Amino acid sequence: RLLTEPRVIIFYITLLFYPISSRLTLLHDVEISTSFLTPWTTMPAIACIVFLVFLGFYIARKSPLISFSILFFLLNHLTEGSLVPLELIYEHRNYIPSMLFFVPVAIFLLKVIDHFSYQKSVQRLITALVVFLLFAQGDTAFSRNALFAHPLLLMEDNVKKSPNLSRVHHNLGSVYWTNGAYEKACQSYENALRFNRHINKTDVAVTLHSLGMCRLYAKGDPDSAMAYLQSAIDVDPSYWPSYKDASICLLQKGSIKEAAEKIRTALTMWPNNSELHEAFGLILLKTGKYDQAILEARRAIAVDPRRYSPLTILAEAFRKKGDIGLAVAYWEKFLEKYPDNLQGNFALIELYFVQNNRGKLFRTVEKLTTLKRSRTWDEFMNDDIDKMAPAAFSPDREKLLEIIENAYLKRS
């Protein structure tokens, strides 16, 4: 690290002087210096840093402002340039250090212009050149900012510029996953694992966990998913999402006892984790332990009152216990936050039917009619119900279709 960081600082300096779009990216692929001569730029970079430090102190009396600007830049890069285990390079770390970077440059330009005070044409030429460079950098900033219009543009750009880094492929996969491009997401996660250029073991675990999610939800292969999730736990036992999703995977496989054991193990390490309590509540719900499921769901909400998903466990647990009123109340509260959630809307259709609440039943059916667009009800349910697993509520497709059909008939 100590050998590599001088090269990184020199790179920061060159970025300030030559910030073209092709050199700017979120994550840079930096070659590690393994000796003073490998790569060859290591020794010259160290020599440049030593020279700048010496120069900063040497001119302190004669030119204190220039001296301060040089030392200010170097001191602000001192933390990352030391033994502190941070990522090697991030462009944003150059923001504060560069505050005074161009003060010496400005002083130099003013002296040059003053030197040619009797040659107005040269002064105009220098001024025009500086103005042109400023406008050119403005254009670079404008084109660079366009990449921030959507995360996909930014991540794809990063993959092009640092194609061998695992993290950039994982980040691209995460964007694909968020946007529903599951096949592309899985391919990106596989690329991240294949390149094996991770920054730390947590990054490896995150990629393995993501591949587990691909196998579980995109591929429908819980056995393969469990293998990836267990590998993630083995690589980094401190990454709690692996435990949570491993327990969900075991639940889908029908290994209820193992799922409960996995989540209990996680809760001993992270007793105040809302998502773990929610996952445990879901497992208890699926095993028919409704009172315990209610307790866990309430614990999840107590730990993080901003979470709404535990309400689905409460709603379904009370429905199973026969308390239709409370079930409806919890589902309606959940839908206040997520009005287009299919699980909640399907659940309320069944509950409104039981309550004989025709007004709310038909309004819910109308909302789903809008969401399904041109698809048939069968296509809509085939596309979307399967994606909800594992969910607190498991809709009966045939029963739902019958209720929806009757709702339309009675309305007409």
Residues covered by each model-derived region:
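Structural marker of alpha-solenoid helical repeat scaffolds
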Residues: K161, F195-I199, V235, M269, ...
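Position-specific recognition of the canonical hydrophobic site in helix A of tetratricopeptide repeat
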Residues: W177, H209, L216-Y217, K244, ...
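Helix-start (N-cap) detector for alpha-helical repeat units in TPR-like alpha-solenoids
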Residues: S166-R167, N200-V206, W240-P241, S274-E275, ...
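Terminal, low-structured helical/coil segments at or just beyond the last alpha-helical repeat
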Residues: K360-S412
